[in-house]
Amino acid sequence: MSDNFEELEPWLERISKQLNAQQKTRLNRRLSTKLRTVWKRRIKAQKDPNGKRFTPRKRDGVGSIRRGAMFQRLPKMLKTSYSSNRAEIGFAGRTAEVMAVHQFGETIKPNSNSKPTRYPVRETVGFSDEDKQLIINEIREFLLNE
């Protein structure tokens, strides 16, 4: 997976010049909503943008593993924001802080009394090749209907 959109930039710039601010806002709303839906499904399936499963949980000190899928409530917390110049999809507040630890596999102290813990990388947000194709298809469909 790569978040590199360099090959799409010239195409997107030409399209951007043809649309007015209201049309750009509608397009950005449509793109962010569609991508949020895809990302929600992917998080619920416990997969990263590459399609690989998340790293499983480690055993605790007693030797048992917590039951249930990680990030069960997370899809509900995925937010979108858009205007004529941008479309954003991500998490806000404390959820964003926690997810950054998982996204990049950081080492933190879960609470003040515990030792530092290294979290494995569990990429929850990012663009897959399918997402890029979805963006292209949505833009084409939008332009055909305008």
Regions of interest found by a model, annotated:
Residues 1-146:
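Short, Lys/Arg-rich flexible segments
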